[in-house]
Regions:
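Conserved, structured core segments of small domains
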Residues: 1-125
Length: 125
């Protein structure tokens, strides 16, 4: 069954103290619903973009590490779920609930494996 990333985005100036107890309970309720449906595989919030590090391979083969996110934008990923869903429509239905519970914009992307990890590389040793 396909898996999907359901991400939510928060503004750079997001204040965690603005999250109410009611909002947290709505998010917890959504997580419980996802678990009961067998859809949720993983979920978490992530540190603010200002604490991110970006890594880029250089022409000399070394890796340059810099402060901050890769892209410059006013919104950054604030958390995400990994969901198993029958199709994109089912993943979008969960994402709509997430957008309501978190009160922030979101994004859905199918996770791709070439080939799927359980299938191996298909190459013999």
């Amino acid at each position: 069954m396909p898996q999907y990333l359901v991400a939510n985005y928060i503004p750079d100036d997001f204040d965690p103290s603005s999250v109410t107890e009611a909002m947290m309970e709505e998010i917890h309720a959504l997580n419980r619903e996802m678990i009961a449906a067998g859809a949720r595989k993983f979920a978490c919030g992530i540190a603010p973009a200002g604490k991110a590090k970006t890594l880029r391979k250089q022409p000399n083969g070394k890796v340059l590490i810099t402060d901050g996110p890769y892209t410059e934008t006013k919104e950054h990923m604030g958390g995400f779920w990994i969901l198993e869903a029958a199709n994109l429509d089912e993943a979008l239905a969960w994402a709509k609930k997430a957008a309501i519970a978190c009160d922030v914009p979101g994004e859905v992307r199918e996770l791709l494996f070439f080939p799927a990890p359980e299938q191996g590389s298909g190459k013999s040793k």
